[in-house]
UniProtKB/Swiss-Prot annotation:
This protein's encoding gene: ssuB1
Protein purpose: Part of the ABC transporter complex SsuABC involved in aliphatic sulfonates import. Responsible for energy coupling to the transport system.
Subcellular location(s) of the protein: Cell inner membrane
Species lineage: Bacteria, Pseudomonadati, Pseudomonadota, Alphaproteobacteria, Hyphomicrobiales
EC nos: 7.6.2.14
Membrane protein topology class: Peripheral membrane protein
EC supergroup of this enzyme: translocase
Domain of life per record: Bacteria
Binding locations of ATP: 66-73
Full protein name: Aliphatic sulfonates import ATP-binding protein SsuB 1
GO molecular function, one term: ATP binding
Membership in a protein family: Belongs to the ABC transporter superfamily. Aliphatic sulfonates importer (TC 3.A.1.17.2) family.
One GO cellular component, as annotated: plasma membrane
Length: 275
């Protein structure tokens, strides 16, 4: 039977986590490196992931793109401990290369806010149990200010726009200051201008906090704008692993970025042979 080196770590599916440098409730988690070797996933007779070999250095921002059904979200769920691989190995490593169990959080396309809780109380959910209530409230206030919702702490989720609700979901993920943050199509339901604003926010908090980030998206432009590296999946295999060498901040429409987008689209459509 194939060994699955995958220690269960603290990943709250509904709530991500982060907070400001001076927030008293938690300390910043060290980013973790991620290594996949021969990773497979099947549902019945359907092989969704086929021999995935991938190393993500600590602190890197990686985007995963591809056609619907290529295995993107399945890969992310396995990374976050929400699903088990059928075969292969998954390791998280600390700065010394030793196996680690990182503080990891995930943000979904649907914010999944609790309607009976205020914005601040929704964010506090991301801390889990055992945190002093005053410290938790202070941390929530700080992280909401960081995502530019400092004036919405006592608001109800139903009164927020779609973009504001997604900012709350991001704050909930960030309040625990994760070492790994997964983003599963987090901007897919937002309008174009709100998406750009959220991209800038995600880029900023990633640069400030230094966590390892894995983004799943259908948007090639979004992937190129945010990631250090873009992985194209095709029928469960890695078809292209493309570095994005451009300095940050990146301007939408930059000719060099447009060229990279073209290469990625060709790989998705299968018109470049994966090269």
């Amino acid at each position: 039977m194939t060994s699955i080196a995958h220690e269960r770590f603290h990943a709250v599916a509904e709530e991500p986590a982060y907070a400001r440098e001076n927030a008293p409730a938690v300390s910043r988690s060290a980013p973790a490196a991620i290594s996949l070797t021969g990773l497979e996933k099947s549902f019945g007779g359907n092989r969704v992931l086929r021999g995935i070999n991938l190393h993500i250095p600590a602190g890197q921002f990686v985007a995963v793109i591809g056609k619907s059904g290529c295995g993107k979200s399945t890969l992310l769920r396995i990374l976050m401990g929400l699903d088990e691989p059928s075969a292969g190995e998954l390791h998280f490593e600390d700065a010394d290369g030793a196996q680690a169990s990182p503080n990891a959080r995930i943000v979904f396309q649907e914010p999944r806010l609790l309607p009976w809780l205020s914005v601040a109380d929704n964010v506090v959910v991301g801390l889990g149990d055992g945190v002093d209530s005053r410290a938790a409230a202070k941390a929530a206030e700080a992280v909401l200010a960081e995502v530019q919702l400092g004036e919405k702490t006592e608001e109800w989720p139903a009164r927020l726009s779609g973009g504001q609700r997604q900012r709350v979901a991001l704050a909930r993920a960030l309040i625990s200051r994760p070492g790994v943050l997964a983003l599963d199509e987090p901007l897919g339901a937002l309008d174009a201008l709100t998406r750009i604003s959220m991209q800038e926010l995600i880029n900023r908090v990633w640069r400030e906090l230094g966590f390892t980030a894995v983004l799943v998206t259908h948007d090639v432009s979004e992937a190129v704008h945010l990631a250090d590296r873009v992985i194209v999946l095709d029928e469960g295999r890695i078809a292209l692993d493309l570095p994005i060498p451009h300095p940050r901040p990146r301007r939408h429409g930059h000719p060099g970025l447009c060229e990279l987008e073209g290469r990625l689209l060709a790989a998705i459509l299968g018109t470049d042979g994966g090269h």
